[in-house]
């Protein structure tokens, strides 16, 4: 069974090192060699700063990483509770990343009197301009009825952001 078992991870997700585009695989040598051939066609190598960061991440005490993972679990739980309080938003619980991806199409066609929300792009701009909360349209991810929000921030700031979001969404009729 070892031949069919492998682990794929990366610094961005495994160690919350956003921007460090370096991944790794633990697999049977035959599988690893095949992956190496494919990967070699996509990039010529990671820069030296990323390589050094990987060494530090992979050889340091893992306790802070485990604590960080628990903190992200707390944030995810709270974000899911906050999303459940927003009428019309539907969201599956994320399992790996520190983003949520709620479906927000129940707000399409609604207006605050000066602006009508036609799509997720409009809603993202509305949230940015009215609630001062940055989101990303789901269109970029093939889900035009969704938006993406990060929970890679303190619980205090997350609470403030969702309070603002809820407040401005209540103005849409």
Q: What are these model-derived regions, one by one?
A:
Residues 1-173:
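PLP-dependent class I/II
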């Amino acid at each position: 069974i070892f031949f069919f078992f492998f682990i794929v991870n990366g610094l961005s997700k495994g160690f919350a090192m956003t921007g460090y585009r370096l991944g790794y695989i633990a697999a049977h040598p035959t599988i690893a060699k095949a992956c190496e051939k494919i990967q070699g066609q996509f990039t010529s190598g990671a820069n030296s700063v990323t390589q050094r960061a990987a060494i530090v991440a992979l050889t340091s005490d893992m306790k802070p990483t485990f604590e960080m993972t628990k903190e992200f679990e707390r944030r995810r739980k709270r974000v899911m509770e906050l999303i459940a309080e927003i009428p019309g938003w539907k969201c599956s619980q994320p399992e790996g990343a520190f983003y949520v991806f709620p479906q927000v199409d129940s707000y399409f066609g609604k207006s605050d009197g000066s602006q009508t929300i036609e799509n997720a792009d409009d809603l993202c701009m509305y949230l940015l301009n009215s609630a001062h909360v940055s989101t990303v349209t789901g269109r970029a991810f093939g889900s035009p009825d969704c938006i993406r929000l990060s929970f890679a921030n303190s619980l205090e700031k997350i609470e403030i952001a969702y309070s603002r979001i809820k407040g401005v969404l209540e103005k849409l009729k």
